[in-house]
């Protein structure tokens, strides 16, 4: 039985580009970003951008029992402010910071990083600016940008919108893993300064902006409100890796969404709590502005934002001064902000006790 031939279509021919996906633009982007990615290379990188998989040779000879540590994160709705201000050069630093700072918490050295960039329509200049920022963040963290994915998805994202995700892998000697098990009552807590809200709390920030009389161009201290809100997240990897070589760190906490009250308990053993003295570090003007314009309680402020502390280092009392001096010598602002105490009967894991002697 002969097959019936379908009649020819009366429609004009279609291409992938007609559907909103420009393969040529994607290829152009890869060529644009290769020099930036190449600047991040480090021993172990075996491939360049453009392949199916990225290869990294683990320096196995340096370890007795190597443990891989992986992390993934995004930038959240801070992206909306970058898009609104048409400033895309530093949002990639935030992406690397959110991943690499999580990796260092376990004591791991970040090795390589991959990114995922999704948008409704690929604008090569904007995408290149973003990924060059990612590469700069990788340089700050000492991690290699070995690959990524650019997804052009018309109909999923509105015009001008995009999203980012990052993936980071590091390595640590098993016997040197930092898991909080060494934390004990009497340990001191050192806070390392943040540069602002970092990449957390921006849904609340945008809500405050909506009802505020201020614009992103309004002055705030010695910069604009937009500048303060787009200041990239600090990357703590290099100074902390160096600090690990000179003192024993009992725990590290990356202060992200949920602030000190939500992140410190993640690294505390049962039956121990953290006592924090908020008078021991200066609060950046942006946090005072957010509290005033949002009419935020102290509790809401501290459980939403980092409030000036981006990383907490838990050490033995005897190592406090050495750790503080070491961090300050490497350009970090750091303060003794609290201590570890036995958990009280009310079960509170983080207590704010302004003015108490440490």
Swiss-Prot record:
Q: List the subcellular locations.
A: Cytoplasm
Could you tell me the gene encoding this protein? purM
Name by which UniProt lists this protein: Phosphoribosylformylglycinamidine cyclo-ligase
What Pfam families does this protein map onto?
A: AIRS, AIRS_C
Q: Which reaction does it catalyse?
A: 2-formamido-N(1)-(5-O-phospho-beta-D-ribosyl)acetamidine + ATP = 5-amino-1-(5-phospho-beta-D-ribosyl)imidazole + ADP + phosphate + H(+)
Q: Which domain of life is it from?
A: Bacteria
Family, per entry: Belongs to the AIR synthase family.
| Gene3D superfamilies xrefs | PurM-like C-terminal domain (3.90.650.10), PurM-like, N-terminal domain (3.30.1330.10)
**A cellular component term, taken from the record's GO annotations:** cytosol
InterPro entries, A to Z:
PurM-like_C_dom, PurM-like_C_sf, PurM-like_N, PurM-like_N_sf, PurM_cligase
Q: What is its EC number?
A: 6.3.3.1
| Organism of derivation | Nitrosococcus oceani (strain ATCC 19707 / BCRC 17464 / JCM 30415 / NCIMB 11848 / C-107)
Biological process (GO) annotations held by this record are: 'de novo' IMP biosynthetic process; adenine biosynthetic process
Which pathway, metabolic or otherwise, does it act in? Answer: Purine metabolism; IMP biosynthesis via de novo pathway; 5-amino-1-(5-phospho-D-ribosyl)imidazole from N(2)-formyl-N(1)-(5-phospho-D-ribosyl)glycinamide: step 2/2
Cited CDD domains: PurM (cd02196)
List keywords of the entry alphabetically.
ATP-binding, Cytoplasm, Ligase, Nucleotide-binding, Purine biosynthesis
GO terms assigned for molecular function: ATP binding; phosphoribosylamine-glycine ligase activity; phosphoribosylformylglycinamidine cyclo-ligase activity
NCBIfam families the UniProt entry points to? purM (TIGR00878)
